[in-house]
Amino acid sequence: QHGRVVDVCNVKDEGAMGMDRAGGLPVNQLINYCFSGKTKDEVKRTFGRRAGMFSYLGTTDFRVVCAKVVEGDPKAVEAYQALVYQLAKDIGAMAAVLHFDVDAIVYTAGMAYEDFFCDDITAYVGKIAPIIRLPGEEEMRSLAEGALRVLRGQQEASQY
């Protein structure tokens, strides 16, 4: 808000599932799973690398997921619809934090290359704000450019 981060959704701990992360989970079921004889490392591996879309479809490649959806694979369609729903819900929650005074909703990373995926999310959230698509991976470049600005004295390091 006004150029500052006011809230985040840490994909390692909460929010929508990802390609290999579980996202937010029902607490009671999670507790039961944790006490089902699994070690701590097994539980962490399951929810941190073998969950999300991977747990349904055996892949972390979103292009493969989309191909299965286009082919009409029922399991892929169901998992895909759950992902879209969860992401739309998270976008709506973040819009609420901003009192729905949102300048834009930005779709980034590799998933933003898929037209129908962006269209499906936009069907839920498109009335909130204009949609901007910036497909591709820019995280490392952005981090490097930010660090360079700090090292050159052009910007102070931010603490979060």
Language-model region placement:
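Glycine-rich phosphate-binding/hydrolytic loop that grips phosphoryl groups
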Residues: 112-113, 119, 130-160
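Glycine-rich phosphate-binding loops at beta-strand->alpha-helix junctions
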Residues: 102-121
